[in-house]
Amino acid sequence: HLPELAFRSLPGADRYPVARVEISRFTARAASMRSRQDVVDVLSNFATQKNLHPVGNQLLLTPEETVKIVSRASKAPTPIHAFAEEVLKSKILRQVLDRSQGFADRLTKHFLQQVAPIEGDIVLFVDLGYSGSVQTAIAPVLEERLGIKVLGRYLLSLETPGWHQDRKGFLGPDLFDNRALRFLTSYIAILEQFSTISMGSVIRYTAEGEPIRGDSSSDDVQNAIRSAAQEACLDYIARATQAFHSPP
């Protein structure tokens, strides 16, 4: 939210098309499962003994389906492995992949409503950072469907596999030691709170591409502090740009 406001307040910013697209980690992963390996990646990266129900939700299983699978898996010596085996059975796997494609259809519709790119365009995905998990999940989907190229631009970007191919950070591994960058990520949650808006994260989209959001966890005091900080930031930008004879 704040990076967009900051950019729009700069002189000459109106020359560049800017759009607010709502894609969360959850929706990016939900739309990215196009093969068995994609489902395996979700299971191997996120499934633990204690979070099988949330993983079932990420795999777009219904609560009833997840309860049945977890119930069967819990009787096995290693429930997490049994859960994965159940999910990867042909019938359930087909459901997951089909639902993910439907989810991707709705996410893509939302994206097109906000951005409306043409084939061959380069779209900059701008965020605070730091690992680029949303970009990693959703960029291949959008690139394949729309014929565009998605590049990430972050305030803070860590050294992740292949980072130099499609992302760059104002504070990034090309300029700073990765140990220093990882130290800064310890405080990224505070920066995220100052940069966001009092709105729940998107959890799905309607058939028309409208975002459906979860509940917001922030309270009135937190919202007031954040609003004051953002107003001060924009005021600083307005004052600072007056010192330039031409836009930086």
Model-found features: residue ranges?
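Long, low-complexity, Lys/Arg-enriched
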Residues: 1-248
